[in-house]
């Protein structure tokens, strides 16, 4: 398994382009589209409510709760498929996770603007493992102070892991694009304190 580790100023990233084999990734992608209870939430930006520009779901152990930008997500139990992925992650990267935020980007018009995963319930220096299924999308990072930028093309079956102080010093996004018309599912595994 090819692993690219990138040490950044104020954090690190690991990128594994073939974390899942294609057959398993294809089946998981189809299963999640059909079995997950997707919802479109509302977030508060600059005092105004907006529909999230993607669909979401949240699964966690022990009814752990998670929210951001003025919304709390409904907590569901881990499915069999999500548990399999979680166990594989634990074996491969040596970190265990108690929750996963799922995002369904229906087309290139769905997005996730500049943000950091720095909510208090994630702890001081969270490790976030982001698994991609479906359409390839560009993932951008930007340093808060130096404005240095870095981009990855997150392909079907790949995983990007963020750690160290990254969430304190960098923001990331999935920008809108007219080049993509197919859906993408992103699973962001994390630990809720």
Specify the residue positions occupied by each region the protein language model found.
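Non-heme Fe(II) oxygenase metal-center motifs and adjacent flexible, charged/small-residue loops
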Residues: 1-193
């Amino acid at each position: 398994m090819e692993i690219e580790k990138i040490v950044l100023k104020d954090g690190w990233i690991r990128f594994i382009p073939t974390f899942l084999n294609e057959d398993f990734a294809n089946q998981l992608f189809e299963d999640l589209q059909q079995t997950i209870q997707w919802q479109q939430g509302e977030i508060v930006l600059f005092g105004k409510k907006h529909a999230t520009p993607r669909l979401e779901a949240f699964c966690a152990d022990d009814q752990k709760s998670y929210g951001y930008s003025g919304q709390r997500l409904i907590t569901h139990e881990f499915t069999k498929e999500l548990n399999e992925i979680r166990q594989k992650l634990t074996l491969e990267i040596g970190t265990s996770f108690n929750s996963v935020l799922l995002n369904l980007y229906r087309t290139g018009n769905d997005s996730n603007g500049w943000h950091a995963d720095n909510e208090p319930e994630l702890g001081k220096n969270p490790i976030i493992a982001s698994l991609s299924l479906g359409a390839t999308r560009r993932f951008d990072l930007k340093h808060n102070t130096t404005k240095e930028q870095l981009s990855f093309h997150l392909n079907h079956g790949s995983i990007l892991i963020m750690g160290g102080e990254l969430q304190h010093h960098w923001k990331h996004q999935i920008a809108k694009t007219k080049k993509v018309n197919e859906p993408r599912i992103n699973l962001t595994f994390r630990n809720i304190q």
